[in-house]
């Protein structure tokens, strides 16, 4: 079981196949999705990865969180999430998961916060049929009708479907096909609609109901956090030169 990623929903567009057929896709962008911490069986009782995405202002991060980010040697992240993984799918702390972590043709499950609709009636919220258009019905064409019985039970039961707030809920859409990836720009194009508004955070993980392709990268596709290491490698050859000059 591999790790997922946190992406930001950019919007929808369409791409064309070789046969000229257009495919509606949702564009998801990964903005420096890095592994922040490990969760292990010995310490936490389960195995998971904590990943973070986006840049957070230091003033908006608590001192305890700053310490955890410093230990992981990553910048403070705006959004954090945990993904359960298997023991052999642990990605090193500080590594950045790239868009080619997913491959075209595989299926993924996406989770986001649905678009808020405000206060909605029964027909929009629960797909009620409404009342008649004629035959004595006036004004109440879109009302929900009766909400309970008579003297017995003499009340409206809890969880009765009625008008109320619609949207802003955690929604998961399963089995969306990955059409294309662009690792350089951090883009993942998935077929169909993804819950949430443009700019919202989306969690993308391997589908739980579809078989994982054989050529999918394990434990994942990522680049090591080598900014500090690169500077040391560049500085190493300069040391002998300074000694010779001395």
From Swiss-Prot:
One of its GO terms (biological process) is translation. Residues 140-162, 214-246 are annotated as: Disordered. The gene is rplC. It comes from Methylorubrum extorquens (strain CM4 / NCIMB 13688) (Methylobacterium extorquens). Keywords: Methylation, Ribonucleoprotein, Ribosomal protein, RNA-binding, rRNA-binding. InterPro entries: Ribosomal_uL3, Ribosomal_uL3_bac/org-type, Ribosomal_uL3_CS, Transl_B-barrel_sf. One of its GO terms (molecular function) is structural constituent of ribosome. This is Large ribosomal subunit protein uL3. Belongs to the universal ribosomal protein uL3 family. It comes from the Bacteria. SUPFAM superfamilies: Translation proteins. Residues 234-246 have a biased composition (Low complexity). PANTHER family: 50S RIBOSOMAL PROTEIN L3, LARGE RIBOSOMAL SUBUNIT PROTEIN UL3C. Pfam families: Ribosomal_L3. Part of the 50S ribosomal subunit. Forms a cluster with proteins L14 and L19. One of the primary rRNA binding proteins, it binds directly near the 3'-end of the 23S rRNA, where it nucleates assembly of the 50S subunit.
């Amino acid at each position: 079981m591999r790790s997922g990623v946190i992406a930001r929903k950019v919007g929808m567009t369409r791409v064309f196949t070789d046969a000229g057929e257009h495919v509606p896709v949702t564009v998801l962008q990964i903005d420096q999705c890095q592994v922040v911490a490990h969760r292990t069986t010995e310490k936490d009782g389960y195995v998971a990865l904590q990943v973070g995405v986006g840049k957070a202002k230091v003033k908006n991060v608590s001192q305890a969180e700053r310490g955890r980010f410093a230990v992981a040697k990553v910048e403070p992240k705006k959004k954090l999430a945990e993904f359960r993984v298997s023991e052999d799918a642990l990605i090193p702390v500080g590594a950045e998961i790239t868009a080619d972590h997913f491959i075209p043709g595989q299926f993924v499950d996406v989770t986001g916060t649905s678009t808020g609709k405000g206060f909605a009636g029964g027909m929009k919220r629960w797909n009620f049929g409404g009342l008649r258009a004629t035959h004595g019905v006036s004004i109440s064409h879109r009302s929900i009708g009766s909400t309970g019985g008579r003297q017995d039970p003499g009340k409206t039961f809890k969880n009765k479907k009625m008008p109320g707030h619609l949207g802003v809920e955690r929604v998961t859409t399963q089995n969306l096909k990955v059409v294309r990836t662009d690792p350089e720009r951090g883009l993942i194009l998935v077929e169909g609609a993804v819950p949430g508004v443009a700019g919202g955070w989306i969690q993308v993980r391997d589908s739980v109901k579809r078989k994982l392709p054989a050529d999918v990268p394990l434990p994942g596709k990522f680049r090591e956090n080598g900014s500090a290491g690169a500077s040391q490698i560049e500085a190493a050859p300069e040391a002998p030169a300074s000694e010779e000059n001395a």
